[in-house]
Curated annotation (Swiss-Prot):
Source organism per UniProt: Drosophila yakuba (Fruit fly)
GO function term, MF aspect, one: histone methyltransferase activity
Protein name: Protein arginine N-methyltransferase 7
Role, per record: Essential arginine methyltransferase that can both catalyze the formation of omega-N monomethylarginine (MMA) and symmetrical dimethylarginine (sDMA). Specifically mediates the symmetrical dimethylation of arginine residues in the small nuclear ribonucleoproteins SmD1 and SmD3.
Residues in coiled coil: none
Amino acid sequence: MSCFSHVMNPITGQNSWQERGDDYDYHLEVANAGFGDMLHDWERNQKYFAALKKTIAGMREAGREVHVLDIGTGTGILSMMAVEAGADSVTACEAFLPMANCAERILAANGAGDKVRLIRKRSTEIQVGEDMPRKANLLVAELLDTELIGEGAIGIYNHAHAELLTEDALCIPARARCYAQVAQSPLAAQWNSLKTIANLDGEPLLHPPEQLKSCQGEAALHDVQLSQLPSSAFRPLTDPVEIFQFDFQRKLEREKQRAQLLTLQSKQPGAAELVFYWWDIQLDDGGEILLSCAPYWAHPQLKELAAEKGKDHPLANVLPWRDHWMQAIYYIPKPLQLVEAGKSFHLSCHHDEYSLWFDAREEAPTKSVRRHTCTCDLHMTYSRSRIGQINQSTRNKRYLRYLEENIEAEKSNVLVLGNGCLLGLASSALGAASVLLHEPHRFSRRLLESIVTHNQLKNVQFLDKVEELEDSQLSALTHVFAEPYFLNAILPWDNFYFGTLLTKIKDRLPESVKISPCSARIYALPVEFLDLHKIRAPVGSCEGFDLRLFDEMVERSAEQAVSLVEAQPLWEYPCRALSEPQEVLNVEFSSFTQEHSLKGSIELKHPGTCNGVALWVDWQLVEENSPRSIVSSGPSEPVVPGEFVKWDMFVRQGVHFPRRPTGGITHLEWSTDFKPVLGELNFSFGQKKL
């Protein structure tokens, strides 16, 4: 059977009914569950297996039976490890039914079907005597996320110890330690606050209003692959310090709320703007088997790992890769100026049942620091990458150069299209006679209204719909301007909604009106990822266990529910270029409704496995052949085949992952079909050996 789903098309801006199989949501959940990423984490798998072998052997030597409970078994991999290590009984639970059904088949295929009791429930719903015959004395689980406690580990462990485990039960992992490092980073700070927008001479055009300056921001973590943050982009103000321990093994309840006040000394002067955060886990009771999520500069095994990889590997790329446990940035509500090395200050560290937050102060706080929230609309409306993009100086300079060269004081009448377009507001500060700002989003509009009021801009009018514009307003326009950026956009070309809006008013615009950007080009680049491709790559076997049934399930679901191109922040995921970029679509916004059907081939100029195709948009501001008239969402430096690509850090690019990448390929064949009226933009890729 099929059903119809209400889907927003980002290019047309219209909701439409889309026919989908009635199991579409199931396939979407399976394809995006993230189990494959964990199974490609060889360090995690090896160390969990080693901890199980060591712990079970130790319990045996002590004359104890071993009854294992595996919470959130997924594929059943940890349960099979426990069986292999000699457990007397293994009970596994998995509440996600598609995964539980797959685990049942995997267990049978690996000869463990009759050795593992599989319960299709959450662990908090299990009853001893009804679901499992006895309490377990060994708990193995992977309940952690980047924040450590964000998936509810505290509550799950507390319930397990109270209801499902014996008094002397051991746990794998046994305990976790959380770390913080205070740092200054003008680059990372751009993801959190709004800077003054200045003209090309450095004179301020738009100042952030007081409510933005005083806003403490959102306490939510900003999860990133911290090792990929350039070392030149931050100044560590302290060494890493341990802030919390979580003992998963103790019978006593783990506290749901704690606070820790640390007195630290700065290593060098700077502004305490943010906290880098990560954790490690001791998988065995003795603490000998350690898995660290530290960035490379703080990793306890950096020297050994670097020696294994060799000198041709940058240090940032030598650590075992994982995307399910990363590092995080927490932004300090009010940055603290540390004027000299050795300056003492206080770091307040807090956690509740699911999250953490931090503050830095010169004087010790007299009461508990509450979790802060956004009060200015900026943080609650825009993503971290969009906030950074608004602040991106090199990008802004190209737009401002266009505006300064084209806006005539008291003569220009400008229509601005897009969400949160501060650069459009800058045309008012540059002296435009009038600025019509299309801003239908309530919170984004409220933010821009506060900026208009604070900067005393008198000639700005807000619009909900471009269709509401009077003929007299449209005929007076001299410029239509956009970045473009729209809140519904996920992939870079979703911002082609700019063309859709233009089409609605095109016939009523004067012939002399200047439209910027005038065109957009999509580029494709065949690449070899070091690791990112693993999120879609089949697992095959893991620690000697056959997981091909899992691969088949995920592949079936991915074919049903996963787009051929997905959005990723590629600066976090190193890749080498295998060729130069090639244009695969050119859209002129003056003739936006024209359909395109294109084909081509890219010759690979560097040996390697093409396990990804990166795609992005270049926006052409004016019709001139100058790099200064292009704003790119792709590489920030020229692409050289065989070298790592340096990507724009404030936007996500599109990525296509070939289903079965192979070596020896000489050409990447591509086709593009674009039907703008329908909002359909489809790519296909094939690998060929000539």
